[in-house]
Amino acid sequence: MEKLLIICMLLISVLVATSQSQTDPETFLRCLVREGSNPQVFISDVTYIPSNSSFTTVLRRRIPNLRFDKPTTPKPIAIITPTTWSHISPVLACARLFPVQVRIRSGGHDFEGLSYTSTAPFFLIDLLNFKSVDVNLTEGTAWVDTGATLGELYYKIAEKSNVLGFPAGLCTTLGVGGHISGGGYGTMMRKYGLSVDNVVGSRIIDSNGNTYFDRMSMGEELFWAVRGGGAASFGIVMGYKIRLVPVPEKVTVFSVGKTVGEGAVDLIMKWQNFSHSTDRNLFVKLTLTLVNGAKPGEKKVLATFIGMNLGGFDKTLNVMNRDFPELKLKKTDCTEMRWIDSVLFWAGYPVGTPTSVLLNPTVTKKLFMKRKSDYVKRPVSRTGLGLILKKLVELEKVEMNWNPYGGRMGEIPSSRTPFPHRGGNLFNIEYIIDWSEAGDNVEKKYLALANEFYRFMTPYVSSNPREAFLNYRDIDIGSSGNSTYEEGKIYGAKYFKDNFERLVDIKTKFDEINFWRNEQSIPVRK
């Protein structure tokens, strides 16, 4: 018995030593020396391990969510910031030899930090050096690298044309890679659909380092999957070829806020019927936030109707007076501007801000953040709305964005791309909780508030499954530490509905060993 115990202890010590050596940064660097065609330049210029003085700076550069920027947050074994696509093959060759995961970071806006952290040992490939945007006015298209931000993309388009744009997100520091691969919506989705509905080509690298430079070489199945199915489950998308869309020389934006005492309830009730059925050139978003009341410590809900119409003052007022006269929109509430300037408006910049600010990929104010999402298929009743507004005041910290669907969104079949939330949806809800105070107990409190409000909203939103939007990633709806099919189906059905099974089949075909995985990746079928 004593001899058996000694043998077991020796075996365990050997296994531990082997595991530690396989996840040691220096061992990884030696592997790169073997695999890299020009290892000296490769290692010194684009690879960072914890002993490098720049490691922390490089890691934190694209972490906007302070929840995942703490001393206790798991850090990568190494960060690779390739400057050419040929740098990636040796990284993948070494990664296949190590018992580790690979995370791909575009802009770092994954709300659960899955693009740059992991509970398992991992390498991080950061695409921040890939930010080329090549606009082709003759074709009306552009090739955009996945490390570019939406702001950089918008700026480059407007640099070439005042009458072309692209339907994508409001936050200009979002990385193109994560945004498009999750669906990507913005103020023109009722007119032109999502970002993925306007992608016509892609380039991708698989786990073996093979590069597919166009749609034909990768095939229609893989091309379908990386347009809304979460590209990080299938490989490293190098770039997307996008179709640019016509925009008028002038668009009109407006923002009108009303409290309950100023008639907000009636306006919200009308908004639920108007926003998805009005002219598709018009997008009117509703935000529900808290403001101070007249008495000390009193809080009340402010409903803000923020809109953009693809047209000038007259067209905007005509449509609003016809379809939403209750808001009593006036010309003085509106501002005419170029489409590129509306990008700044939606991003929260003051009118007149130079467009060059879009070239700054840095998040100016970092916060602790939690996001959740829902889909609404029938109008919330007046009674239900009253309860929702009351709950917002009770919890104090939760805010809501209601984003209208309809128009083009209702015409595209749910199976056209992996993003399934099409016809039948009135609007999408984004739940927002941001805070600045540090501390584990503070974080637990706010996460509990988010979950409490999410449970409270159950009667008013979709069910079986309760649908969710991948770009508002929420680990609470399900996760899989082992990327199993059974666990993956729990969150997969919510993000992708019936499209989940097709994604699993494609994943199994193109990544049978499940090399590309995270806590909410597409699993393989076993």
UniProtKB/Swiss-Prot annotation:
The FAD cofactor is bound via a bicovalent 6-S-cysteinyl, 8alpha-N1-histidyl FAD linkage. GO terms for molecular function: FAD binding; oxidoreductase activity. Glycans are attached at N52, N136, N273, N482. InterPro entries: BBE, FAD-bd_PCMH, FAD-bd_PCMH-like_sf, FAD-bd_PCMH_sub1, FAD-bd_PCMH_sub2, Oxid_FAD_bind_N. Its cofactor is FAD. Pfam families: BBE, FAD_binding_4. Its EC number is 1.1.1.-. It is an enzyme of class 1 (oxidoreductase). Disulfide bonds join C31-C94. There is a cross-link at H109-C171 (6-(S-cysteinyl)-8alpha-(pros-histidyl)-FAD (His-Cys)). Transmembrane segments: none annotated. PROSITE patterns: FAD_PCMH. Binds 1 FAD per subunit in a bicovalent manner. Keywords: Cell wall, Disulfide bond, FAD, Flavoprotein, Glycoprotein, Nucleotide-binding, Oxidoreductase, Secreted, Signal. GO terms for cellular component: extracellular region; plant-type cell wall. Residues 72-247 form the FAD-binding PCMH-type domain. It is found in: Secreted, Cell wall. It comes from the Eukaryota. Residues 1-21 form the signal peptide. PANTHER family: OS08G0158400 PROTEIN (PTHR32448). Belongs to the oxygen-dependent FAD-linked oxidoreductase family. This is Berberine bridge enzyme-like 11.
